[in-house]
Amino acid sequence: MKKRADPRKIKREEHKQKLSKLQERVDNFGEDEADKEVSKFEELPLSEATIEGLKNSHYVTCTDVQKRAIPPALQGHDLLGAARTGSGKTLAFLVPVLECLFRNKWSDVDGLGALVISPTRELAVQIFQVLRKIGRCHSFSAGLVIGGKDVAMEADRLAKLNILICTPGRLLQHMDQTSGFDLSNVKMLVLDEADRILDMGFKKTMDAILENLPVDRQTLLFSATQTKSVSDLARLSLADPKYISANPDTTSSTPKNLEQNYVCVELQDKLDTLWGFLRTHTKFKIIVFFSSSKQVRYVYETFRTLQPGIPLLHLHGKQKQGARMDVVSKFSKASSSCLFATDIVARGIDFPAVHWVVQVDCPEDAATYIHRVGRSARFGKSGKALLFLTPTEEPAMIQRLEAKHIPINKLTIRPNKKKSIKNQLQALCFKSPEIKYLGQKAFISYYKSIFIQKDKEIFQFEKIPSEAFAESLGLPGAPQIKLGKSAEKMKEEANAKKNQSRALQKLMRAGDDGVVSDDEKEVRTKMDRMFERKNQNVLSDHYLNMVKGDADEDEETGDFMTVKRQDHNLESDDDEDIANLPTSKRAAKQALSKKQSLKNKGLGTKTLFDDEGAPHALYEFDDEEDFKAAGPVESQVKEFVDRETKDMEEADVGDKELVKQKRAEKKRKRKEIERLRELDEYDEESEEEGDSEEEQAAKKPKWFQRDESSDEEEDDGVLEVEEPTTLEDLESLTSKLLKK
């Protein structure tokens, strides 16, 4: 009797055979000429679960970068992928991640197998959402680790993850704090927007992360502007990397369907131009880029008050994570809206159907320009881009763009489209000290952003019109700016502070034993928080910073503009008030009486002020010496008479003109009354004539005015009358018959 086969064993054997066939297809892919003309995901050597996930997510056709990057990534090569914005780079590295773990039979007990690092939180969330869609048919566990979330909750789940999508700062924090977080089994490392991650801002963080990763891993780098720096590639320990470039025949890095233009405007006219643009594009979806978060907040708060007629949103790195995700969701769903943002949404974020990308501040280089305009014209759709350049920035920046083969045209603004809002901004700053403070911070942050730029040919710091720019923001004058350090050092410190984890900063403040000081660990109750509660509006912190008087001037990282309050010696009236207090009930009653209080106050005095602001009494008399010094009495009298005569003549001219105007107005009113009266009389006459005609028509016609109907009645020979009842009726009937 034969032994029955185990179905689980048969299933395992079938799975092994499928894996071996799939591995064979991957190894041999590209040898046949037909493999080079792949157009669909089904034609690639992918697992059934991945193909099914792509189909369910409506991904059927491969883009150029996907069919060039996926096969070598499946074969285990390190890649440097460069493609236009909106060309599908996310799928180009997520599909190899799933296939790598699937062919290695990865399970929960194997730990973390793939690591995807993104420079911004919003981009990491977007990558995670795409991974959930295409990987739904696999059994891998994936997680998202970004700043702004609960660290303890993330730490509990890290040990069970197979695929981790994260930002550099939060990943390094978990590597330092979370026990059991092991990166020794990582098979694949993916850096999205690699040129941004490898720059100076993330240098220390990325070096610490790379030290803990295995050397034999596979590394994929993707960006629209890829780095080829030897030092960067050496840091990543790439082994014979392959450079993948989509559309190598074309030279431009921007989408073909993107219409790119620029306008040359003065710095002080930028907000006026932006206002006019928004007023004429209220039915479009627009992203407006600024160089700093302070400028974003100022423009958002002021434009929101002025109401340009289009929904406004703002997004910058100083917002809480929940607020940032809410703004991204609202803008993605909106059909017409304007988003004021910094460069945190310049890379990788896919906002659907963006019509316009407006860059109010000049980008630092051509690569930043490419990433910004890439938010529009994605996946073959059309879009438009507009760049604001000052006359000093225009020549050098256009040269940089032409060197990258970026086609851009110059536009001129119609005079009828220009509208100045300087007066409105000045009124807002005058009414609200919070808006004024935001304007000061926006002014300073713009100056700092220009000062720290490397390309001094484009950004000429000394040629900025400070007073005119401050006036355009509604400020009474240009704030003072402290720039004690070099531009390179300031930029390095700003990037390090911006990208460093706040939790790591807290650990750095701990002692040698790793214990944080008691002051920072002090328990604060609900009652303490209630008494510490301050003004709850969005600008309360800025207002407090403006009015506080104990700021440290030597603090280099603090605010540039703070109002210093100085103590003055004030005369105290407490002693007089105590002396005037009533001593009895009667005196207290008299003190409450208005009549009695007026007796004690005495007579009031009237003071006049001259043109210089000096006070004078209402009547001032000259001394005898002053009177004699002015000259003889006769000459003074003559001068006085002449002066008064001249004043009276000038006043007489005005009085005559006023009387003339009053007479003309009186005459005009009289004629108007007469005209109205004539119209009323004419209307009455016309009505009377109409009434008389009706009366005549109602009268009985004469014998010679009889109509046809009366003739017909007479021709009948019949006279219809009522039955006579009296003698008078009989007499009248007799007379009628005789007449007939």
Swiss-Prot record:
Disulfide bonds: none annotated. Residues 1-37, 565-740 are annotated as: Disordered. Gene3D superfamilies: P-loop containing nucleotide triphosphate hydrolases. Its main location: nucleus. It catalyses: ATP + H2O = ADP + phosphate + H(+). ATP binds at A83, R84, T85, G86, S87, G88, K89, T90. Residues 680-695, 709-731 have a biased composition (Acidic residues). The keyword Nucleotide-binding applies. A motif (Q motif) lies at residues 39-67. GO terms for cellular component: nucleolus; nucleus. It is found in: Nucleus, Nucleolus. Residues 257-421 form the Helicase C-terminal domain. This is ATP-dependent RNA helicase DBP4. It comes from Yarrowia lipolytica (strain CLIB 122 / E 150) (Yeast). The lineage of its organism: Eukaryota, Fungi, Dikarya, Ascomycota, Saccharomycotina.
